[in-house]
């Protein structure tokens, strides 16, 4: 199938300055992400950035395109919408948003989310999830949960523990870490969109829920659009947010 990968890459990061240009065994992090995207068979890979230093760091890569975008975007999705405009992408083009801090993302996951959207015409967006397997993630606000309807359309995404098991999630069980979390799904932050929807997304007002939870996908649900969620065929390793994360990736690639 045909799809395009867009990788938003902001230079400034609160916890890791110049994060896209961090060295990982002789390659920048953003270059490693583009390599994984190319392995997916995408017909085009575009890095969307707001900083000339990232443009310069990628000049030697002939297989990808780099798009300079505005520094004023509120989210990575808004940045994707600008890419659609600059490249004049056809309305039915499928765009996969790959995070710029995931140098180990499996190419199969990129293919899966693109296929997911292609096969679900009622959805404006497709994304992935995975069963929560660690009790530490049940009440971890950084592990975003998703609840779906019977057709695997998202009902809600939250940093809170949803669905809440009224009978099992007692204070005692929480303290003993003996809660039953088999019904919980963790959201995996990869998305597929049609270019037509990205253009529409850029015109949508920011939703109160999005501001409250700091989850941009809630803008989609707030405005009445559907997000299809499928369980990932392979669980992507966590992205890089801290120096410890960076070392973990380096250790993984060294073995």
UniProtKB/Swiss-Prot annotation:
Keyword check for rRNA-binding, yes or no.
no
GO CC: one term?
cytosol
Q: Which reaction does it catalyse?
A: 3-deoxy-alpha-D-manno-oct-2-ulosonate + CTP = CMP-3-deoxy-beta-D-manno-octulosonate + diphosphate
One molecular function GO term is: 3-deoxy-manno-octulosonate cytidylyltransferase activity
Q: Give the pathway annotation.
A: Nucleotide-sugar biosynthesis; CMP-3-deoxy-D-manno-octulosonate biosynthesis; CMP-3-deoxy-D-manno-octulosonate from 3-deoxy-D-manno-octulosonate and CTP: step 1/1; Bacterial outer membrane biogenesis; lipopolysaccharide biosynthesis
Q: So where does this one cross the membrane? A: none
Provide the top EC class: transferase
Q: Name one GO biological process term.
A: lipopolysaccharide biosynthetic process
Identify the InterPro entries for this entry: Cytidylyl_trans, KdsB, Nucleotide-diphossugar_trans
E.C. code: 2.7.7.38
Highest rank taxon of the organism: Bacteria
The question of whether Translocase is a record keyword is answered with no
Q: Which Pfam families match?
A: CTP_transf_3
Q: Where in the cell is it found?
A: Cytoplasm
Q: List UniProt keywords, sorted A-Z.
A: Cytoplasm, Lipopolysaccharide biosynthesis, Nucleotidyltransferase, Transferase
What PANTHER family does its record include? 3-DEOXY-MANNO-OCTULOSONATE CYTIDYLYLTRANSFERASE (PTHR42866), 3-DEOXY-MANNO-OCTULOSONATE CYTIDYLYLTRANSFERASE, MITOCHONDRIAL (PTHR42866:SF2)
Q: Which family does it belong to?
A: Belongs to the KdsB family.
Protein purpose: Activates KDO (a required 8-carbon sugar) for incorporation into bacterial lipopolysaccharide in Gram-negative bacteria.
Q: Protein name, please?
A: 3-deoxy-manno-octulosonate cytidylyltransferase
Its source organism is Psychromonas ingrahamii (strain DSM 17664 / CCUG 51855 / 37)
């Amino acid at each position: 199938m045909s799809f395009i990968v867009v990788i938003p890459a902001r230079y400034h990061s609160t916890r890791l300055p110049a994060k896209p240009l961090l060295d990982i065994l002789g390659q920048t992090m953003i270059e490693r992400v583009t390599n994984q995207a190319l392995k997916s068979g995408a017909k085009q890979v575009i890095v969307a950035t707001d900083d000339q230093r990232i443009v310069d760091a990628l000049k030697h890569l002939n297989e990808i395109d780099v798009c300079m975008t505005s520094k004023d975007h509120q989210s990575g999705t808004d940045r994707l919408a600008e890419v659609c405009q600059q490249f004049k992408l056809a309305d039915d083009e499928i765009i996969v948003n790959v995070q710029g801090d995931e140098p180990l993302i499996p190419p199969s996951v990129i293919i899966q989310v693109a296929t997911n959207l292609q096969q679900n015409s009622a959805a404006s967006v497709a994304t992935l999830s995975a069963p929560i397997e660690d009790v530490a993630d049940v009440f971890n606000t950084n592990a975003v949960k998703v609840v779906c309807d019977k057709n695997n359309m998202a009902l809600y995404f939250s940093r809170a523990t949803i669905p809440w098991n009224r009978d099992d999630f007692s204070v005692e069980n929480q303290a003993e870490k003996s809660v039953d979390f088999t019904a919980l799904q963790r959201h995996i932050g990869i998305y597929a969109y049609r270019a037509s929807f990205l253009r529409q997304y850029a015109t949508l007002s920011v939703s109160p829920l999005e501001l409250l939870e700091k989850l941009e996908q809630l803008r989609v649900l707030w405005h009445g659009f559907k997000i299809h969620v499928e369980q990932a065929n392979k669980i992507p390793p966590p992205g890089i947010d801290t120096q410890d994360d960076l070392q973990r990736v380096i250790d993984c690639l060294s073995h």
